């Protein structure tokens, strides 16, 4: 059995993009699985396939293989081998072991938290392979949890569930990140439990010192904890009371009495702080993905600009703005244009301190732009 694509679908795969949409599939099997993709008689790729979803074809290999399952699992073995050194050096840390398309393992994410793995599968073909995924992880971890509760699974016709695949899965684990420790709720936390893509950026922010810092969209205090090592007072803002409870717990875990939490809508709070004349030496903005799709980009641009504008107005002269976007639809040129426009409207000048992005364990494929989603930039406000 094979998948036949039209010229447009073939062009995408020949350019080494991994995705072909259903509208560009001419014919294919009726059941999801792993299949070869052809354009006429020409072999193009091996792919995860689901005829019932818009994103029908997800390529993982551009050469034929006798055993498609073995070829996919070889990609998994290679992804784990690329992380082996860091796991030996930092077994108590938090890292991404599998980054979906970035590791040629579309629809699969595996995160590592101090000896325990959390798996999320969002492509149908992975469902029957999860026991083999757990076995591949066995040499590296004490337990494996399948946290398959993402709503995107429903688009694939898959059930939502959370259950152990291997070993005894603890409710929570303690992760060491540089000089900071934090607790991860493996079953109930957002994503797989924490936001590991900002790990290196959180560590980078430890170099700054000052009186007052503001961490907006703080979640469980990720940036706030690192900032508290160098600032007299850090204010962590989030709209979730539960997230802030965890932030306070993490602050206590580290003996940090200088972290104060505020439950509030970020946009409303930033406007209020400006009216009250509050000023900060540093502001971190780590908002959610305002642009979930292409149709959201214009609205998202306005939202990102508004929150950056308000943050810039709160900064003292010489203060530091660290700002992020985790939407791949908000491209890098758009992101920097938005920040520049926000600075212009605030009548302030920004000096680039550093442009950053995803860490090594969230690899980017140049031919597949969707893998490059995280922008993180640090500016000095003049």
Swiss-Prot record:
The highest taxon in the source lineage is Bacteria
Q: Where does S-adenosyl-L-homocysteine bind?
A: 202, 217, 238-239, 265-266, 286
Phenotype when the gene is knocked out: Lack of methylation of cytosine at position 1962 (m5C1962) of 23S rRNA.
Q: Which InterPro entries match?
A: PUA-like_sf, PUA_sf, RlmI-like_PUA, SAM-dep_methyl-trfase, SAM-dependent_MTases_sf
Enzyme Commission (EC) number: 2.1.1.191
- What keyword terms does UniProt attach to this protein? Cytoplasm, Methyltransferase, S-adenosyl-L-methionine, Transferase
Top EC group: transferase
Q: Give one GO molecular function term.
A: RNA binding
**Localisation:** Cytoplasm
The UniProt record lists the PUA domain at 3-60
Q: Can you name a GO cellular component term?
A: cytoplasm
Q: Give the positions the UniProt entry annotates as the active site.
A: 326 (nucleophile)
The reaction(s) catalysed by this protein are: cytidine(1962) in 23S rRNA + S-adenosyl-L-methionine = 5-methylcytidine(1962) in 23S rRNA + S-adenosyl-L-homocysteine + H(+)
Q: What is any one GO biological process for this UniProt entry? A: methylation
Job of this protein: Specifically methylates the cytosine at position 1962 (m5C1962) of 23S rRNA.
Q: What family, per the record? A: Belongs to the methyltransferase superfamily. RlmI family.
By its UniProt entry, which PANTHER family does this protein fall under? RIBOSOMAL RNA LARGE SUBUNIT METHYLTRANSFERASE, S-ADENOSYLMETHIONINE-DEPENDENT METHYLTRANSFERASE DOMAIN-CONTAINING PROTEIN
Q: What is this protein called?
A: Ribosomal RNA large subunit methyltransferase I
- Species assigned in the record: Thermus thermophilus (strain ATCC 27634 / DSM 579 / HB8)
């Amino acid at each position: 059995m094979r998948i036949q694509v039209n010229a447009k679908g073939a062009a995408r795969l020949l350019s080494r993009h991994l995705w072909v949409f259903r509208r560009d599939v001419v014919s294919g099997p009726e059941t999801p699985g792993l299949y070869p993709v052809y354009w006429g008689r020409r072999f193009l790729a091996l792919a995860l396939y689901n005829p019932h979803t818009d994103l029908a074809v997800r390529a993982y290999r551009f050469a034929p293989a006798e055993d498609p399952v073995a070829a996919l699992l070889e990609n998994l073995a290679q992804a784990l081998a690329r992380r082996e050194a860091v796991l030996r050096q930092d077994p108590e840390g938090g890292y991404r072991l599998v980054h979906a398309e970035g590791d040629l393992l579309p629809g699969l994410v595996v995160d590592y938290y101090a000896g325990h793995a959390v798996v999320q599968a969002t492509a149908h073909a992975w469902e029957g392979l999860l026991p083999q995924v757990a076995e591949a992880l066995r040499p590296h971890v004490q337990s494996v949890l399948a946290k398959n509760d993402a709503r995107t699974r429903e688009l694939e016709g898959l059930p939502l569930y959370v259950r152990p695949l291997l070993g005894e899965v603890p409710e929570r684990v303690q992760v060491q990140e540089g000089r900071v420790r934090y607790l991860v709720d493996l079953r109930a936390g957002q994503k797989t439990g924490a936001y590991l893509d900002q790990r290196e950026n959180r560590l980078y922010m430890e170099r700054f010192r000052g009186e007052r810092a503001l961490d907006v969209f703080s979640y469980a205090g990720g940036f706030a904890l690192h900032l508290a090592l160098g600032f007299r007072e850090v204010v962590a803002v989030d709209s979730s009371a539960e997230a802030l409870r965890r932030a306070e717990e993490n602050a206590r875990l580290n003996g940090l009495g200088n972290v104060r939490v505020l439950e509030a809508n970020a946009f409303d709070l930033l406007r209020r702080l400006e009216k009250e004349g509050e000023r900060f030496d540093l502001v971190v903005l780590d908002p959610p993905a305002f642009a979930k799709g292409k149709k959201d980009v214009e609205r998202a641009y306005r939202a990102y600009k508004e929150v950056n504008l308000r943050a810039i107005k709160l900064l003292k002269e010489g203060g530091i703005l660290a700002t992020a976007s985790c939407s791949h639809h908000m491209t890098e040129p758009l992101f920097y244009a938005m920040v520049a426009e926000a600075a212009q409207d605030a009548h302030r000048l920004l000096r680039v301190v550093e442009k950053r992005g995803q860490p090594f364990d969230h690899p980017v494929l140049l031919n597949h732009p969707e893998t490059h989603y995280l922008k993180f930039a640090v500016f000095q406000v003049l």
